[in-house]
Amino acid sequence: MSEKNLLTALSKMITEQRNPNSMNIDQLSALELVKVINQEDKQVPLAVEKCLAQIAQAVEKIVQAFQNGGRLVYIGAGTSGRLGVLDASECPPTYGVSSEMVVGIIAGGERALRHPIEGAEDNTEQGKAALQAVNFSQKDVLVGIAASGRTPYVIGALEYAKSLGATTVSIASNPNSAMAQIAEIAIDTVVGPEILTGSSRMKSGTAQKLVLNMLTTASMVMIGKCYSNLMVDVQASNEKLKARAIKIVMEATECDRTVAENTLKIAENNAKLAIMMILSDSDKTTAEQLLSKHHGKLRQALVN
């Protein structure tokens, strides 16, 4: 896109407009300034609320993918890419899943997590190549993230995923974006102009984080990664998480600490298995068989 055409496109984007509520922020005290930011931030959950139907639709597609051996893949550039990588990296310790189940891709690669990479987002072919590098297939779900809704890198990835017949989802902060025209499911969190004109790491980034939280949390809950609201598949990989696993077993079963610790030891720190053993009064092997029969869904295994 030529510089003239790009300027024209940017001038039409809500995320590139000047915010009338922040015109004088360079004259405000610290308290006045953070009040303005806070007031603007209140619009973010309201914008996300308007997209709940689309978010739920995406969750259903992600669940189907997981159940059929597929993955959730995030792709973005800059802040959008970093948020995708962040959300993906939280899934293994929180839900005990493989690091391959939810994948985050950022334009420019690992270095781009900490440093700006000039021009990394400007090439559609690089977006396609990034998916090919992780063997993206029809079984997977692609979530393209870009506040502008026009990032070439993300568009290239969405077009490639769509050509394979995979489910495609876009997350943008401008309505009717180029990404939305490609994606099967368009999540347009229109949060309005930023406090700092064009600084989409702010409200737009916050909206993206809220949506990503919903996508992975709801999907993991629906495939049985929690019991009530407890993280029963948590990986007890450090002292804090080991203590949390004990607490989870105690709360789920109403047992004392000694029972929880002893059962967790037998269950090799698997909180879900320990809970199953205690509540079904069964040994480790029987509890494992019951959970396997019900695809790891603890509540269903206990009921049946």
UniProtKB/Swiss-Prot annotation:
Keywords assigned by UniProt, alphabetized: Carbohydrate metabolism, Lyase
Pfam families linked: GKRP_SIS_N (PF22645)
Record-level Gene Ontology MF annotations: carbohydrate derivative binding; carbon-oxygen lyase activity; ether hydrolase activity
Pathway terms, separated by semicolons: Amino-sugar metabolism; 1,6-anhydro-N-acetylmuramate degradation; Amino-sugar metabolism; N-acetylmuramate degradation; Cell wall biogenesis; peptidoglycan recycling
Gene3D superfamilies in the record: 1.10.8.1080, Glucose-6-phosphate isomerase like protein, domain 1 (3.40.50.10490)
An annotated GO BP: 1,6-anhydro-N-acetyl-beta-muramic acid catabolic process
Catalytic residues as annotated in Swiss-Prot or TrEMBL: E90, E121
EC numbers on record: 4.2.1.126
Catalytic activity: N-acetyl-D-muramate 6-phosphate + H2O = N-acetyl-D-glucosamine 6-phosphate + (R)-lactate
Classification via InterPro entries: Etherase_MurQ (IPR005488), Glucokinase_regulatory_CS (IPR005486), MURQ/GCKR (IPR040190), SIS_dom (IPR001347), SIS_dom_sf (IPR046348)
Domain named SIS: residues: 62-225
Role according to the record: Specifically catalyzes the cleavage of the D-lactyl ether substituent of MurNAc 6-phosphate, producing GlcNAc 6-phosphate and D-lactate. Together with AnmK, is also required for the utilization of anhydro-N-acetylmuramic acid (anhMurNAc) either imported from the medium or derived from its own cell wall murein, and thus plays a role in cell wall recycling.
Note: A lyase-type mechanism (elimination/hydration) is suggested for the cleavage of the lactyl ether bond of MurNAc 6-phosphate, with the formation of an alpha,beta-unsaturated aldehyde intermediate with (E)-stereochemistry, followed by the syn addition of water to give product.
Family: Belongs to the GCKR-like family. MurNAc-6-P etherase subfamily.
Subunit structure: Homodimer.
Protein name: N-acetylmuramic acid 6-phosphate etherase
UniProt organism field: Actinobacillus pleuropneumoniae serotype 7 (strain AP76)
